[in-house]
Amino acid sequence: DGFEISAAALNHRVPSYAYKIRHQRQVKQLDRDALYAHDLPAGPLWGMLQNGDDVYYQGRNYPASLYVEQHEQQVCALIGGDNDTPSLLQAASDGVQVLVHEATYTQEVADKVGAFPMHSSAKQTAEFAYQAAIPNLVLTHFSARYNDAQALAPLLAEAKLYYHGQVHLAEDFAQYRLLPSGEFQPLSASDA
């Protein structure tokens, strides 16, 4: 619950889409300083307040509404399929914390192969992510000419020339964590 998914059409030889996935939730946080200041010891009574229940302790009433603050947390990712025009995602980029988008080749290779393949270069994707102020970028859908980590280095280098956020090269089966703060972390096998 709390998920919202929307689609945006992309530009490719066959129908292709990007999906914006947003998760919002209400978070309750105890005002610990106020509870200590009003002499309510930490323990099960705090749990009752956290659950929204008023507490009566040593002749004093502790209304949950005075000690529990609610705020909204959200995470938002935009995941694109085949696309030669990253700017098509402009309208969908509001609030996005991570963009997963193809960078099939470097701009030099893109210029050589021409427009027909209808894929984005690392430069195009990085420029869009920078312009849209998206803090994290995951590049994916690499041409077969980039067949190992060393061969992928020019894609990463090109992206970093045009984008100054966190950049990752997608790997099969890799997992990441996106925190409400916008921090984007690769997970190790033990974290997953």
Residue ranges and their predicted role:
Residues D1, Q74, Y163-Q166:
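A short helix-to-beta-strand connector/capping loop
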Residues D1, Y56-G59, A77-G80, P117, ...:
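A short linear-motif detector with a strong N-terminal bias
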Residues F3-I79, N83-A91, V98-V100:
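Active-site-proximal loop/helix segment associated with metal-binding centers of metalloenzymes
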Residues T85-A192:
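Binuclear metal-ion centers of metallo-dependent hydrolases, dominated by the metallo-beta-lactamase
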